Amino acid sequence: MKQIQTIEKGANFSAADFGRLADIKDYVLELAPEVRIPGKVFGGGAVGATGSEFSFQVFAPGQETGFLHTHRTHEELYFFLSGKGEFQVDGDVFPVGEGSVVRVAPEGRRSVRNNGTEPLVMLCVQYRGNAFTAADGADGDILNEPVKW
């Protein structure tokens, strides 16, 4: 089973390597001894994320999640990095592919499938819904310091 590699850690950062997108299929997420999801890996813990979780997942042609799910508090953003498929939210089905981004509220009943001929690779970011305010959009500060390469 493929493992996440630590690149570097510091007081204010951590970096990890998940490998090539083509190799995401080699990860296996074990939810319980009898529940294994091939081609999925969560990464928030590997980088010490404190306000979100994320996962990479790959679906082979014809593969789907096989279930609908919701969240109690987490909104999700799905970024489709390659391939083609379909996404379903609350019974609405629509096409997704490389460059598509889907936001789903916690209550949205969601599922995804690959109806294409190539692997469908996605990055899912989940975070507490309704927590981001207009003021958060101006949270960044540009520093008057040289960049050291």
Stretches with model-predicted labels:
Residues 63-65, 75, 82-84, 107-109, ...:
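A generic structural motif
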Residues 56-60, 70-88, 125:
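Short, conserved beta-strand element in jelly-roll/cupin
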Residues 48-52, 60-64, 84, 128-131:
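Short, charged/polar surface micro-motifs in flexible loops or helix N-caps
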Residues 91-107:
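Short acidic-glycine-tyrosine-enriched beta hairpin
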Residues 35-42, 55-71:
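Conserved short histidine dyad/triad with adjacent acidic residue
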Residues 86, 106-132:
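Ligand-binding loop in jelly-roll beta-barrel domains
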Residues 1-51, 135-149:
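A short, N-terminal "cap"/entry segment at the start of jelly-roll beta-barrel domains
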Residues 50, 88-92:
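Short strand-coil-strand connectors
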